[in-house]
């Protein structure tokens, strides 16, 4: 009872803090001068990280097993992963771009986890025999950390595509005469003062998005690879085969292939930027199919802890 109450308190405290942090981010996005307010939001994410950590530890102690046995626990761990990805660059380089992605991602996942949809599995149950293995921590934690990093990196690529598309659309309007000559003449005058600085800022932003997208996706790909390999070893111990082409395994392999292609395109300078970002955007959709969409089916060797099983 005590652990359940503590878990309930930590869940709502962390969710409330993340909600406040998102609001602060929106305010600082509109008013750049409020530096102290932004610093408060960063401290809020750190507090959220420790609250979610306390929540996971509490659930671990109360259940007797690592809290990664169902969809609710994996969503909480995913939210924890987003917070972890947020605070590490903050302490090292104070990366502002990444925080715009990790904050909303954390509140989205934790908000869904604490919603009424998953109420029936909020209480920890007995671990099913298939999950009673020392590989649980290694395999599932690496997979969730991989998903979190890949999602963040993919969202950075989506932002890169949006900015690039807006820039190209403006150039398209100019080249096809959709803007009248007098307007272009006035614009050319302004280019001597503000256009160069604006384009420099946009170019720097695109480069940063591309750089951090690559860095975060590389990290996520490493986690995903470790997760798949450890899962194969676990599968051999549990089911007698390293690979069974289960729906979850198949989509995890597809996810790995997509991001392997992304990393391969990065070796070609001409394919960096928007071209590789398109592949990462496709990967973003594939991750959600692998992580959440397959659970909707409720079939296969990974059907335990699925979304549909919560209502059976």
Swiss-Prot record:
Similarity field: Belongs to the CcmF/CycK/Ccl1/NrfE/CcsA family.
Protein's UniProt keywords contain Cytoplasm: no
Sorted UniProt keywords: Chloroplast, Cytochrome c-type biogenesis, Membrane, Plastid, Thylakoid, Transmembrane, Transmembrane helix
Assembly, per entry: May interact with Ccs1.
Entry membrane topology: Multi-pass membrane protein
Compartment(s) of residence: Plastid, Chloroplast thylakoid membrane
Listed GO CC annotations: chloroplast thylakoid membrane; plasma membrane
Name recorded for this polypeptide: Cytochrome c biogenesis protein CcsA
HAMAP family linked to this entry: CytC_CcsA
Disulphide-bonded residues: none
Known function: Required during biogenesis of c-type cytochromes (cytochrome c6 and cytochrome f) at the step of heme attachment.
InterPro entries for this protein: Cyt_c_assembly, Cyt_c_biogenesis_CcsA, Cyt_c_biogenesis_CcsA/CcmC
rRNA-binding among keywords: no
């Amino acid at each position: 009872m005590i652990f359940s109450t503590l878990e309930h308190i930590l869940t709502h405290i962390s969710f409330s803090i993340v909600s406040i942090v998102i609001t602060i981010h929106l305010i600082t996005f509109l008013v750049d001068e409020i530096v102290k307010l932004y610093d408060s939001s960063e401290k809020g994410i750190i507090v959220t990280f420790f609250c979610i950590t306390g929540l996971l530890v509490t659930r671990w102690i109360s259940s007797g097993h690592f809290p990664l046995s169902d969809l609710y626990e994996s969503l909480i761990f995913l939210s924890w992963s987003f917070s972890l990805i947020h605070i590490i660059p903050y302490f090292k380089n104070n990366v502002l771009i990444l925080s715009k992605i990790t904050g909303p991602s954390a509140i989205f996942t934790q908000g869904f986890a604490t919603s009424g949809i998953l109420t029936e599995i909020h209480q920890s149950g007995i671990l099913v025999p298939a999950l009673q293995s020392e590989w649980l921590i290694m395999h599932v934690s690496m997979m969730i950390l991989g998903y979190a990093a890949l999602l963040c990196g993919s969202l950075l690529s989506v932002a890169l595509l949006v900015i690039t598309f807006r820039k190209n659309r403006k150039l398209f309007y100019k080249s096809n005469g959709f803007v009248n000559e007098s307007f272009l003449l006035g614009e050319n005058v302004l280019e001597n003062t503000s256009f160069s600085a604006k384009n420099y800022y946009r170019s720097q932003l695109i480069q940063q998005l591309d750089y951090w997208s690559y860095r975060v996706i590389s990290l996520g790909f490493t986690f995903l690879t470790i997760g798949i390999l450890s899962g194969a070893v676990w599968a051999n111990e549990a089911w007698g085969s390293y690979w069974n082409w289960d729906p979850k395994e198949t989509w995890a392999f597809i996810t790995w292939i997509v991001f392997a292609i992304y990393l391969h395109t990065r070796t070609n300078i001409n394919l960096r930027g928007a071209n590789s970002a398109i592949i990462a955007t496709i990967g973003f959709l594939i991750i959600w199919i692998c992580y959440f969409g397959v659970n909707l089916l409720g079939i296969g060797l990974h059907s335990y802890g699925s979304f549909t099983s919560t209502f059976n």
